[in-house]
Amino acid sequence: MQLLKWLSVTDRFYKIYLDKQLAPYGINNSQYMFLIKICRSPGILQDSLLNMFYVHPSNIVRTVATLEKQGMITRSPNDKDKRTCKLYPTERALSIIDEIQMICEKTEALLLQGMSESEQNLFMDFLIQAGRNITSELHIER
């Protein structure tokens, strides 16, 4: 039960911490990863986000709509498939993305504080394996 407890504690408090750091930029812990990906891959298909982030499709639709409403991204129809959209960052998003990336890097450093580089690598390997174990059990393959 200790593993579940500390996964829960870490998840809850890193999100609170990240929300405080991201607040001046008008985004939160559920939006930053989408914004980073869209800024780094302009024209990315909305549907491709599903395979990257292991979230429910409704979360993607809601987050994309919120980012668009906030003036962070624009949507453009996909000429090859009208059922999906291409996503592009706005100038506003591009002007803050480096700071957001830095906040994420500092948050990761905080979480890994006190671990050697080899311990950090092992921790990441173990965390990835745990994630694969649970997604495989739930038959979520990406």
Region locations from a protein language model:
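Short, locally clustered residues in the helix-turn-helix/winged-helix DNA-binding domain
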Residues: 8, 36-40, 101, 128
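A structural signal for well-ordered alpha-helices, especially hydrophobic packing surfaces
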Residues: 11, 97, 131-134
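Charged, amphipathic alpha-helical coiled-coil/dimerization segments
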Residues: 15, 65-128
